[in-house]
Amino acid sequence: MIEALIVGEMQDVQIGFVKQILSLNLVPRSNNTTCGNNTSLCDFSEMWYGVFLWAVVSSLIFHLPAALLALATLRRHKVARFFPLGILLMGIIGPLFGGVLTSAAIAGVYKAAGKSMFSLEALVFGVGQSLFIFIISFLRILATL
């Protein structure tokens, strides 16, 4: 009986976690803080983490299909079959180094202005970083043609 109760509580926690991620509520808190509502990001670390998390996720969303396509088309090539590893590494390493700095800059501007950031703004800034990197990378390839 106790095991069933514990399993039921674990399922509630997992459902709550999934709901939290899907609803963009990165930081759950009670409304006894200085933030305007439960979903706004007020501290520098919360804003930085929100933007950084979305930058990493969106970068992987861009790079994972490219790596899978490269793996499918180049799997029999002697040297080029290792290109998907490079694509995946760039999808992870880029946001880890560049995304950390740009996310900190965005969060610093918000903190210096004394504004709080909504979770949707963190999504827009994070995905925007990856989108700009994608566009610049594509334009650099076109410039070499």
From Swiss-Prot:
Please state the protein's primary subcellular location: endoplasmic reticulum
Q: Which residues lie on this side of the membrane: Cytoplasmic?
A: 72-81, 139-145
**Got any disulfides in this one, which pairs?**
none
Going by the UniProt annotation, this protein carries glycans at: 31, 37
- Membrane protein topology class: Multi-pass membrane protein
Provide the alphabetized UniProt keywords. Endoplasmic reticulum, Glycoprotein, Membrane, Nucleus, Transmembrane, Transmembrane helix
Q: Which residues lie on this side of the membrane: Lumenal?
A: 1-50, 103-117
Any one of the GO CC terms: nuclear envelope
Q: Per the UniProt record, which residue ranges are transmembrane?
A: 51-71, 82-102, 118-138
Where in or outside the cell?
Endoplasmic reticulum membrane; Nucleus envelope
Pfam families membership: Tmemb_170
Q: What's a single GO BP term from this record? A: endoplasmic reticulum tubular network organization
Q: Which family does it belong to?
A: Belongs to the TMEM170 family.
The record ties this protein, via PANTHER family, to: SD17342P (PTHR22779), TRANSMEMBRANE PROTEIN 170A (PTHR22779:SF2)
Q: What does this protein do?
A: May regulate membrane morphogenesis in the endoplasmic reticulum (ER) by promoting ER sheet formation at the expense of ER tubules.
Protein name, per record: Transmembrane protein 170A
User: Which species is this record about?
Assistant: Danio rerio
